[in-house]
Amino acid sequence: MSERMTPRLFPVSLLIGLLAGCATTPPPDVRRDARLDPQVGAAGATQTTAEQRADGNASAKPTPVIRRGSGTMINQSAAAAPSPTLGMASSGSATFNFEGESVQAVVKAILGDMLGQNYVIAPGVQGTVTLATPNPVSPAQALNLLEMVLGWNNARMVFSGGRYNIVPADQALAGTVAPSTASPSAARGFEVRVVPLKYISASEMKKVLEPYARPNAIVGTDASRNVITLGGTRAELENYLRTVQIFDVDWLSGMSVGVFPIQSGKAEKISADLEKVFGEQSKTPSAGMFRFMPLENANAVLVITPQPRYLDQIQQWLDRIDSAGGGVRLFSYELKYIKAKDLADRLSEVFGGRGNGGNSGPSLVPGGVVNMLGNNSGGADRDESLGSSSGATGGDIGGTSNGSSQSGTSGSFGGSSGSGMLQLPPSTNQNGSVTLEVEGDKVGVSAVAETNTLLVRTSAQAWKSIRDVIEKLDVMPMQVHIEAQIAEVTLTGRLQYGVNWYFENAVTTPSNADGSGGPNLPSAAGRGIWGDVSGSVTSNGVAWTFLGKNAAAIISALDQVTNLRLLQTPSVFVRNNAEATLNVGSRIPINSTSINTGLGSDSSFSSVQYIDTGVILKVRPRVTKDGMVFLDIVQEVSTPGARPAACTAAATTTVNSAACNVDINTRRVKTEAAVQNGDTIMLAGLIDDSTTDGSNGIPFLSKLPVVGALFGRKTQNSDRREVIVLITPSIVRNPQDARDLTDEYGSKFKSMRPMDVHK
């Protein structure tokens, strides 16, 4: 059964293999924070000035919040509209002349004789009327005149049941009228209108209408529905509704509101003082133009006024009152970049004073360490940049302390301890306090490491001066992306005098007119070979190019004329004015101290130090505003020699003695350089010249005196190697620059596709 399936499975297996061979590795997915997207294109890549960063921190200090209103408290268009009319008097057809007539006679003349309407007069309606209309009046005007004279006599005309009922004013509502939302022009006698309000409350509208309305004209208010009910004749209702339209406006949009934080003193007390001067009870022209409310939780004063420009004047008064306050308060400032303890020390240097507590030492960011680059003090490199050696005093970076260590622990970043572990420095107390002298006053400043916050107890005036200094110091430091290529070049042929000599002297002008070919390379002496210089090597026909921003071209050019071996190609980010250490090699134990107490056979004690060997590069960049990068560089290539033969014995006393220490062949350069952003500098001249003697020949015969040379020969090989260092610093001013570098490396990884073996 299996033999029959085998031919069928073979094509399937072959197809799967072909598909797997054609598959490619998907490109890496780089995820980013969308908040890092540039908002203004290329402007996002520019360096932020100290002034701009200070403005960005302005939100940290309490600033007034002002909303300026329109200043419009009434409906201007409604107030300017003309009053409604009933038509011209010339359109009328009747004239009246009443001299002390009774109300009943006037009602009969207008309603009965002129308009022909049914009417009923209640017994309680009494009064006399004097009325004359030399010009003819219309029926609508006559009805309006009747409503007016009835109102003067405390009577109302209510249309109900197809007739007009003339009743006393206090009986006009009960059981005779119902609320309506119709237009006042449709009113026939005394009616009631329900008016919904948009912005103003019903109770406030009642206060506004009371001076203009007849007694009992405001029937009622409903706060839950925010409506007001009005009663009156057509003319009265038109006036009432027009008044409502004038005052029912967006009051909040017209009012100006300001919230002013108080630095010294209490908001409640300051608000009460302002109320006495500008409030409703004050005897000033601006009385009632302001409303002051203390906000105790925020220690601020809320100011409301219908005039926007008044807020500026109130702010000036508040600033004067706040500045004049001599009270001492506790201020806090949460720092973003610099350590609180270090900033407290800087403030002590600026304003003068003294401090106590915590550990001193400058640092640009929380957790950062500032050290010094230096040479050895005892011939060995001991890196104390991160951590310290037990029992030893800390030395400079690139230097060695003279102390000893039983454990052999080193604090080198990227290195290892004697037990093979990288150790962080112990957590130290970074809290501290200083006392400043600001404008003759003592100011207490406390640094809280847990929240990286400064606590300052002082007056508001002194706090302003201290805060200005804090905002200038608490800025984001720039970073530098350093690409280095460390190579070892074999000095043979044209390179026998060194790499630098080769570029300066062995490169001459080409013979061809077009600048290509010729027996020699184009001259680079005096031209700055790190600019755009190109030519060709005629010995093997390989072209080469030097570019100021392309260190790989230099490596490629040297690789064509000699043997070249890359020792290290690190790429690292480092903060401005901080140190980057790269170490690839071995740690060699060195017996520094041996003590024999003489108290028995096993009474010898030794102290061992571990020395870093291999390729060690230490760089500290310092960036200027114009894009120049100053570099402090220490480069070392060290190789341990062979251990003495006597140390291979089993004797413990011999192996552990200082005589068993190996020699370390070291090539080191320490320099300071200045380079433009993105350009490459080369360090050369670390030449190692070694000679190896050897002999071979016929055994025994080649060792005979005098004639032994006839049966053998002696050899002597000279080996010259030079270490060159190419360093390219690139300034990273903001997160967008860091993203661009990530994209560049990501594109390089994407281009590394698997090889297609089927082609």
Swiss-Prot record:
Region (N2): 254-323
Signal peptide: 1-21
Biased composition (Gly residues): 392-401
Gene Ontology terms describing biological process: protein secretion; protein secretion by the type II secretion system
Biased composition (Low complexity): 40-51
Lipidated positions per record (N-palmitoyl cysteine): 22
Protein name: Secretin XpsD
Record lineage: Bacteria, Pseudomonadati, Pseudomonadota, Gammaproteobacteria, Lysobacterales
